[in-house]
Amino acid sequence: MTISVEVFDSRRNQLGEGPTATGDKNSHVQWCDIYGQLIRSKNLITGEINEYKTDEPVGFQVPRKNGGDILGTANGPVLRDKDGTLHKMPSREDADGFKDKNVLRWNDAKVSPDGNLFLGSMAYENQTNEGALYRLSSDGKALTRLFGDVAISNGMDWSNDLTKMFYIDTFAMSVDVFDYDAGKLSNRRKLVEISDGMGYPDGMCSDSQDNLWVAFWMGSCVRGFDGKTGKQIAEIKLPVQKVTSCCFAGEKLDQLIITTAVGNPGEPMDLTEYPEAGFIYVAQPGVVGKKTNLFGA
């Protein structure tokens, strides 16, 4: 079965990432443009668009229960109120006990169903394994380093019964699964092996049946995988190379929002071959997804 896609938002993003869907009927779709230093949004129902600038590159945006966002700015994370006021939060240095050896930034992040924020880091020179995965407590006061030796910390999500966490370190070329218990991770193993030619696994979300929907950088698609067996079950092709992440949206959570990118700074930008690079897309893969979890602090 061919799953068609259409453009949802044609504002071009240098590096669109981390979409979420909140509000009435899960219609407030929001994402970040990491190197454009922008948080952008569009309403699925009304079509209303908004955006605001950040002072630094912003690796993720996570909506809060009381309004505003948690932003993965280069020196953050920071808590942003609805009026734009910023509040400092625990930093990597607080969690690690030492400063970054090289220049790192935050990348993907997601709130677990039990309220913790999991957030990962990566080096700008992303071939090095200097990144790590962290957990921020639901009150926003304690940042804990869970493990290091990460190249590009990327997509994550949880099983319905909250006993498993799925995780992507892009250059590991796999989708891994952990046993999950109240914010603690153990027993890491590979669920999906990514073959040469498929592209690089990037952001990810899961549906109500615990199937995984993985965006592929340099792969021009989102692929669906069975969350129990790792078998590929679907592919959504896009007219761009660099597909970055996805989330479910809409009243029935049956619309898949897909972010894409022009590329990283310094990379050649060929908009002749891929004129829609950096656009946001929407598809209906025929499944029901999960709601975006909000952060409590």
Q: What is each of the regions a protein language model found here?
A:
Residues 4-10, 47-53, 86-99, 141-148, ...:
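A short beta-strand motif characteristic of beta-propeller blades
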Residues 38-40, 76, 131-134, 174-176, ...:
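A short loop-to-beta-strand structural motif that recurs across blades of beta-propeller domains
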Residues 43-47, 81-85, 137-141, 179-184, ...:
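Short loop/turn segments that connect beta-strands within beta-propeller blades
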Residues 247-297:
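Blade-level signature of beta-propeller repeat domains, shared across WD40, Kelch, NHL, RCC1
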Residues 22-24, 29-35, 69-75, 119-127, ...:
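Conserved beta-strand positions in repeat-built beta-propeller and related beta-rich domains
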Residues 11-26, 54-73, 96-116, 146-164, ...:
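Beta-rich, blade/repeat-based domains predominating
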Residues 83-123, 127, 140-142:
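Asp-box/WD-like beta-propeller blade repeats and closely related beta-sheet repeat scaffolds
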Residues 174, 193-231:
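Loop/turn-rich, solvent-exposed surfaces of beta-rich toroidal or solenoidal domains
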